[in-house]
Amino acid sequence: MLMPANFSSLVGEFMSSTIPKYCVTIVKNRYHNGHPDLIPAGMFPDDAIQHVPHGIEIKASRYLRSWQGHNPEDVWLMVFVFDSNRPKDETPRPFRFVKVVGAELSKDDWLFSGRSETSRRTITASVTDSGYQKMMANWIYRGSGFE
């Protein structure tokens, strides 16, 4: 069984791998843990770059807001919000996307959470209300009942 965070990662990786099949001007960044996930095709050797401001970062989440990344930075962000069963659910329901939003966010659209010196958790930054408003103003897909 997958941990819930791993399932979100799997959905995000699926979208990062699938979108370039239908949009030949972008490719999945081939650099291990490179940022962003999608970069302009042919711009970098072997379509691999550790960090660059060009491209789109992809996230998948079961939450309608409060999305997180690892660093507050200027980035195009695309979030695929989905609905699916959780491990405790007894009655199965089909996986579905409920909304897809994307926008260019600035460092000011993130709130850095950091961590204490004794913490082992991964550092995170959360999309602020200003970032959320940008994302919602530039919606790509909205399923019925999830506006």
Q: What is each residue range found by the language model?
A:
Residues 1-35, 39-55, 60-147:
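Nucleic-acid endonuclease domains
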